[in-house]
Regions:
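Long, contiguous internal "core" modules enriched in hydrophobic/ aromatic residues
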Residues: 1-113, 129, 189-192, 203
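Extramembrane terminal tails and long inter-domain/linker segments of multi-pass membrane proteins
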Residues: 78, 143-156, 164-213
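Catalytic-face loop-and-helix region of soluble metabolic enzyme cores
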Residues: 108-120, 169
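Central hydrophobic cores of alpha-helical transmembrane segments
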Residues: 118-128
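Hydrophobic transmembrane alpha-helical segments of multi-pass transport and channel proteins
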Residues: 128-135, 161, 165-169
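Membrane-proximal extracellular juxtamembrane segment immediately upstream
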Residues: 131-146
Length: 213
């Protein structure tokens, strides 16, 4: 679809800052490093614009595809309402849409957007909605119905679920290690540790020289 590249860009610029804001909040709460409010506010403004544009494009696609429904719209129709009594992905679609709409409304309200207790909730809703829309709402319905008109519902297997969770876990582990190292360098903790080790070594060397003398 011609709007697909724009939707990918807008949702990426909405989901990415959501994850960054959540990381900033965790850093501010659990480390000595302080993230300025202006940086978080700028990211929240970017999310508001990009999420609103993504929702507008989604609604436009729904109207265009379903206004004069053809066989090409069966995938979207199945995603929204189901086909032939098969509705496995319908809850995923509507939950994604509700998450993004609720998050967008929260971001539109300045009192919520600048409230750092409510802002993480909006970020989680937006990120979850976009993740569902890009996974269960985009990849899977592309194969439903099949080119010959068959409708076969898809259910993630246990192995697929474990692999997905494992990939996310490895990603968060790498991010945690990198953030700990970067924060340690920026705050001077690693430098102080090296200096302390150097001083200990010099003292040990001096004591050994005195003993030899």
């Amino acid at each position: 679809h011609s709007m697909m590249p724009i939707r990918f860009i807008t949702t990426a610029f909405a989901a990415g800052p959501c994850l960054i804001i959540l990381a900033f909040m965790i850093i501010r709460k659990n480390t000595k490093m302080w993230i300025q409010d202006s940086a978080i506010n700028l990211l929240a403004d970017i999310i508001t614009w990009c999420l609103g544009l993504a929702l507008f494009l989604t609604m436009s696609e729904i109207v265009v595809e379903l206004y004069a429904r053809t066989e090409h719209a069966n995938g979207l129709y199945y995603l929204m309402f189901g086909l032939h009594g098969l509705t496995a992905l319908v809850p995923w679609f509507w939950s994604s849409l509700v998450f993004m709409i609720v998050a967008f409304v929260m971001f539109l309200i300045p009192g919520v957007r600048r409230n750092y207790k409510l802002l993480p909730i909006a970020c989680v809703l937006a990120f979850a909605g976009i993740w569902i829309e890009k996974g269960m709402g985009l990849i899977v319905p592309g194969f439903i119905p099949s080119p010959i008109g068959e409708v076969t519902e898809y259910y993630p297997t246990f192995i697929e679920v474990v692999m997905t969770v494992g990939n996310w876990a490895i990603g968060f582990l790498i991010l945690t290690v990198l953030l700990k190292g970067a924060i340690g360098i920026l705050m001077g903790d690693i430098q102080l540790a090296r200096r302390g080790a150097g001083e200990s070594a010099s003292r040990t060397g001096g004591a050994q020289s005195a003993v030899n003398a």
